[in-house]
Regions:
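Conserved phosphate-binding catalytic cores of ATP/NTP-utilizing and phosphoryl-transfer enzymes
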Residues: 269-275, 328-329, 358-363, 389-390, ...
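A contiguous, well-structured pocket-lining segment that forms one wall/lid of small-molecule binding clefts
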Residues: 175, 182-184, 427-457, 461-465, ...
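Glycine-rich phosphate-binding/hydrolytic loop that grips phosphoryl groups
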Residues: 506-529, 533-535, 574-583, 703, ...
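Conserved phosphate-binding/catalytic loops in two-lobed NTP-binding clefts
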Residues: 480, 497-509, 724-729, 736, ...
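Internal gly/pro-rich beta-alpha loop/helix module
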Residues: 146-147, 162, 334-419, 619
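A phosphate-binding glycine/aspartate-rich beta-alpha loop in the early core of alpha/beta enzymes
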Residues: 75, 231-298
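Intrinsically disordered, low-complexity, mixed-charge
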Residues: 1-175, 179, 184-186
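Active-site histidine-anchored catalytic micro-motif
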Residues: 514, 519-581, 588-591, 611, ...
Length: 794
């Protein structure tokens, strides 16, 4: 009997059919393989021993980009053919399958890229079944060239021969291209167009003219917009302080760190501390931005990298070239490219104005980015869906995702339980959305802060695209409780004939961590520390200890409620938070140095706001407490990006953490659970400020105190409930000092501590938690659903 085999997982666009063909041919089997909308279907016939080997080798020898979730084998009638064939793809109504993210250029393609004898020498769109664009060019499944943005480029005879040769690694590589038939680059200045490459020009010198010109402009201090895999970057010489300052001014990004791209790993090792795990991430096929520690002596200055790239920080986001085009821009050794030397480290930041989505379309980029860039390095391969660079950090040999996008999305998060087709829309900041079906949670690429029309449109386009690709017709829509979030409004105006479920922000964080770690529906102690989240009482939460499962939660403890004078304005002015806290707690602070440059009239107005409760919402936010302390001790009164004050305090605190002792603190029993009082803690901090204790030591003592409070709260919860598992989630846990001390302390106290493994702990992972909660809480939410329907029918 023959075998019919169904393979599910990421098995399209990764060279799986050519692999199956080669394996079957090697084992002298006959039959066929084809893509369907749901995966890969195989019929094989031959000797029984060979069939057994074939099934075994499907998993053991699969292509590097393939991820197999399941293999189903059934008996089938004998196949009458005498050879093995690749059949045309078949669309199956309602079927779907995960698709591969875009992947960095593979070693084989990189070698060919710089081989003068190769047809694709210095060709910026070289790729094969093991690398290149996937997610950003796919319009539909099954994954075939007509369903991608490469449909506009008919293959030449040479590429067609490779595409149809089962022994070639470009066999059925859908984005296959060469200089004769594929995309090409061109360089334009803001007001003129340079002679540039043409797809049918054989001269290497002419074909590379745009890249050579771009290298010269970068060396001379200009800012160049570069079209990449998932959108545009803005690039400039990282060693030129004038250019970096100009880029900051044009982009309106005054302090937030820029990422850089370095020519090679040796260059990175010269300027940053580099551990083995970090090097593995940098050179992985995903090639994310990796946060690395700056070398303290000689290294950071070796290439004269400007301090303006990442001011007041001890680390920097670094990545290696991940597309052929990036390699051509940064290569230091090729004889043709060497005619225009280029700095070995370039600033490589998102191609947008701050808070806007990155540009993807040539026409849009030329209009929108003209005030930012002096020149544009364009290409004519369309980007169907944008995808920002992913940002990660090594956390005790594991990956901490700060932003999960290119290289990782839309790989699904496997769930240990089945879920209904669900759309979870996430939060307002660092937005991702989540689609679920079966045992998968498809967390989207990074959308960003959905506070402007452009990002809102990107959000809606992303939902439409992924819903279509994964054939998800939601039966549940889930949103954050905050009534003024765009995502909440979007969810509430969508499809009134299905359940609409609101989920509390910090409950979603804890559920996200649980799902990320593959936990079933059981209660855990959840420490959800972040900057903001709408509470069930209408206050702004953020320093929360919950007793939570997927189905429900109970608030066990929280930070004391204190006012935010000016509301959102306070998040940009930590001095307002500090002063508001001190006024409310009756702490004398008029003599403190941080007030020296604060207008007295502004202080009087702030005091009136607090006393009269005018635009001063109450908060239990841990993030705002970090901001207040950073202001109290003189680090920063104003911020230009989220968590700036807290991050700078962490940097200054690191040298003192090992010797710092916690401040006194009080946890008070109240009728609504335990409350962490702040008067004693803040008074002790101000006493150290008056005693001229170093800023770093005060910051370190504060970090140690919060860690002790967190562990103390967990002990109290365990005594009452016998719960022993703790989930840590929320953006504050990206603070490495706090995470290390709490996680280690919990484990020493025999707790089981969980932190995120596959998705960010910040709001970039929020939608995952929303989705799983909605699936478990349907019965509990029936009253909310009925109310929504009643309101919707009016």
């Amino acid at each position: 009997m023959a075998k019919h085999i169904s393979v599910k997982g990421v098995v399209q666009g990764v060279g799986f059919r050519p692999f199956v063909y080669g394996l079957a041919t090697r084992l002298d089997l006959h039959g066929w393989v084809c893509n369907t909308s749901g995966g890969v279907e195989i019929l094989v016939d031959g000797q029984s021993s060979s069939l057994e080997e074939f099934i075994q080798f499907l998993s053991l020898e699969k292509p590097p980009l393939a991820k197999i979730d399941s293999i189903q084998v059934d008996e089938a009638p004998c196949d009458s053919s005498s050879n093995f064939e690749i059949h045309e793809s078949q669309a199956v109504e309602g079927a779907y399958q995960p698709i591969s993210p875009d992947m960095a250029i593979c070693p084989d393609c990189e070698r060919e890229l710089f081989d003068p004898k190769d047809k694709r020498y210095l060709y910026p769109f070289i790729n094969c079944t093991h690398c290149g664009p996937r997610f950003t060019i796919i319009k539909d499944i099954p994954y075939d060239r007509p369903s991608t943005t490469m449909a506009n480029f008919p293959m030449c005879d040479h590429c067609q021969a490779e595409y149809t040769d089962p022994l070639n690694r470009r066999f059925h590589a859908q984005p296959i291209a060469c200089p004769e038939c594929g995309p090409f680059v061109e360089l334009r200045e803001t007001h003129s167009q340079f002679p540039t490459s043409d797809p049918r020009i054989s001269s290497i010198e002419i074909r590379t003219s745009a890249i050579l010109k771009a290298r010269r402009l970068l060396r001379e201090g200009y800012i160049v917009a570069i079209k990449g895999l998932g959108g545009f970057h803005l690039a400039c010489d990282a060693s030129n302080p004038y250019t970096v300052a100009e880029l900051r001014d044009r982009k309106g990004r005054f302090d937030k760190p820029f990422a850089v791209m370095a020519a090679n790993i040796t260059t990175i090792a010269s300027v940053c501390e580099l551990q083995k795990e970090e090097q593995n991430l940098l050179t992985s096929r995903e090639k994310p931005i990796v946060l690395l520690t700056k070398k303290k002596q000689n290294g950071w200055q070796a290439y004269h990298v400007s301090e303006l790239v990442a001011p007041n920080l001890d680390n920097i986001g670094v990545m290696l070239p991940y597309t052929p085009l990036h390699h051509l821009l940064l290569n230091q050794t090729d004889p043709i490219l060497a005619r225009e030397p280029v700095p070995p480290i370039l600033v490589m930041t998102s191609g947008n104005f701050s808070e806007e989505p990155i540009a993807t379309d040539n026409t849009d980029a030329l209009q929108r980015l003209s005030p930012l860039a002096d020149a544009f390095l364009l290409h004519n391969r369309d980007i169907h869906i944008r995808s920002d660079d992913s940002v990660v950090r090594v956390d005790k040999s594991n990956i901490m995702y700060l932003r999960r996008s290119r290289g990782y999305a839309p790989y699904p998060v496997p769930l240990p339980f089945e879920v209904k087709p669900t759309l979870a829309v996430g939060g307002e900041l660092k937005n991702t959305f989540c689609l679920t079906r079966d045992h998968y949670a498809f967390l989207s690429h990074h959308i960003g802060d959905v506070e402007n029309v452009e990002t809102q449109e990107s959000f809606e386009q992303g939902i439409a695209h992924l819903s279509h690709i994964f054939r998800v017709e939601p039966e549940i829509i889930v949103y954050d409780l905050h009534p003024n979030y765009f995502t909440t409004e979007y969810a509430k105006r969508s499809k009134l004939d299905i359940p609409h479920i609101g989920v509390q922000h910090h409950h979603a964080h804890i559920a996200s961590c649980m799902a990320d770690n593959g936990l079933d529906n059981r209660r855990v102690i959840g420490l959800s520390f972040d900057g903001t989240g709408y509470g069930t009482d209408g206050a702004i939460w953020g320093g929360e200890a919950l007793l939570a499962s997927y189905a429900d939660f109970e608030r066990f403890a929280h930070l004391e409620y204190l006012p935010l004078p000016g509301g959102d304005a306070a998040t940009r002015s930590p001095w307002r938070i500090a002063a508001g806290y001190a006024y409310t707690l009756g702490i004398d602070f008029d003599d403190l140095p941080f007030l020296q440059n604060i207008d007295k009239q502004a202080l009087r107005i702030l005091r009136q706001q607090v006393e009269k409760k005018l635009n001063s919402p109450l908060t239990s936010s841990m993030g705002r407490l970090f901001d207040a302390v950073a202001s109290f001790i003189g680090i920063r009164n104003e911020v230009t990006y989220e968590a700036q004050a807290a991050v700078e305090m962490e940097v200054l605190s690191k040298p003192f953490v090992s010797i710092a002792k916690p401040y006194p603190y009080v946890i008070e029993e109240t009728k609504n659970g335990r409350m962490i009082r702040l008067r004693e803690l803040l008074s002790a901090i101000l006493q150290d400020v008056r005693a001229s204790e170093s800023v770093g030591m005060i910051g370190a003592r504060f970090h140690r105190t919060i860690a002790e409070i967190a562990i103390d709260i967990c002990r109290g919860a365990r005594e009452l409930t016998d719960l022993n598992e703790v989930a840590l989630s929320g953006g504050v846990w990206q603070n490495q000092i706090l995470l290390d001390h709490v996680r280690d302390g919990l484990r020493q106290d025999n707790f089981v501590a969980y932190f995120h493994q596959q998705v960010p702990s910040n709001d970039g992972g929020l939608a995952l938690g929303q989705a799983v909660i909605a699936n478990y809480a349907r019965a509990e939410q029936s009253e909310l659903i009925s109310e929504h329907r009643r309101n919707g029918s009016k």
